[in-house]
Amino acid sequence: MLKIYDTLTRSRREFIPLTPGKVKMYVCGMTVYDHCHLGHARVLVVFDSVVRWLQTLDYEVTYVRNITDIDDKIIRRALENHEPFGALTARYIQAMEEDAAALGIISPSFEPRATECIESMVTMIESLLSKGLAYVANNGDVFYDVRRFPGYGKLSGKSLDDLRAGERVEIDTNKRDPLDFVLWKAAKPDEPSWDSPWGKGRPGWHIECSAMSGHYLGERFDIHGGGQDLQFPHHENEIAQSEGVHGHPHVNYWMHNGFVRVDNEKMSKSLGNFFTVREVLARYQPEVVRFFIVRAHYRSPLNYSDAHLNDARNALERLYTALKNHAPSQAQAAEEATATIDWVNDGYAQRFMAAMNDDFNTPEAVAVLFDLASEANRTGNSHYASLLKALGGILGLLQQSPRQYLQHPAHPQNDHHSIEEIERMIQQRLQARKEKNFAQADALRQQLAEAGIILEDGPQGTTWRRQ
């Protein structure tokens, strides 16, 4: 029985989909004005893991992850760069897709762009106006009137008075209340705009997600996810918009992943500890970064540091080493490739399922992987290695060739030895040993060791891995 922590009710709830056997899920994606940072990577990996587990439970998942391709930040960056906003967003969408692919992210069922759904947004704003939940200001902007929505603040757990006291809101004389938020922004010179009943303009950020989720998933869907930073005001405002239009809750389970911290400090450009995914991938294999993310529970803070990434790299290496040392024969591998995981009788599989059904507890699931590796090392039984790979695959891990993974440079940007060069030196060492020139053979081994290359001599010959 799958249980999910629902942010709205602040409780673990049994997951019961609206339609048996099917799951509809929406996750807030990137605003594409820059490269993905570690916070984006966490959202991508966390909800990719959620989708993978739901599919493992035989649900048919419709997964929508939007792209915000029109926003104040995008417009400012395009003006700074003296380029069309469409060229800017196209470049960063391509970069995002490359980063997601590197991290092993399954493509969503739909990945709508805000600029493709303007008509749906206009229709939704018209409905809010007709219900008296929105108003057109003197400057042509359209605002949501938060005082007209009785449930405002229920996701963040705060009243309007609490929110007014705690929020730093810029004074806008066009608003009736400081917490009122914009649904439609009147056109300004040198900014992209679209036609609407209120004149040319562009949508506000919050209406984009309400319109896109409703367009692709309907008035009500199962799961809405995103980073903790979106809980207020973005998701609070989505509730006000969608419930305001439809008259009923539009999401059954709200999921939020925790913040990313860097060396126990908040990640920010002002502190100089801001890292893009590309900067991290220049130093670590993508699978190490994914493994680092799934080792932490999705709702817990994730503390990034070189020490933690190095620890994740070493831990993942132990799992791949177990796979390499205890790989099944070709015949066994072919047989086990068609076999399904025995969730009923296999104790390791049962523990893995219990962990994932407990609010996607990936740290406990990863612990099962290490127990399997230990059992494979203890018994030499390839069955445990096969199960290790199968369960790891559910988390998007351990699907590379163990030998290739272990031969990949630990820190790509610092790698000074190609595979061809390493193989050449190994052959030179083998030749030296044949000629009983053990001094030269030892010197070559030492030279490789100093470069972080570990040689392993065995009955089948010499293999190697990076330290």
From Swiss-Prot:
Motif ('HIGH' region): 30-40
CDD domains on file: Anticodon_Ia_Cys (cd07963), CysRS_core (cd00672)
Chain ranges for the short sequence motif 'KMSKS' region as given in the UniProt record: 266-270
PANTHER family for this protein: CYSTEINE--TRNA LIGASE, CYTOPLASMIC (PTHR10890:SF3), CYSTEINYL-TRNA SYNTHETASE (PTHR10890)
Residues where ATP binds: K269
Quaternary assembly: Monomer.
GO cellular component entries: cytosol
Reactions catalysed according to its record: tRNA(Cys) + L-cysteine + ATP = L-cysteinyl-tRNA(Cys) + AMP + diphosphate
The entry's keywords: Aminoacyl-tRNA synthetase, ATP-binding, Cytoplasm, Ligase, Metal-binding, Nucleotide-binding, Protein biosynthesis, Zinc
A Pfam short name: tRNA-synt_1e
Protein name stated in the entry: Cysteine--tRNA ligase
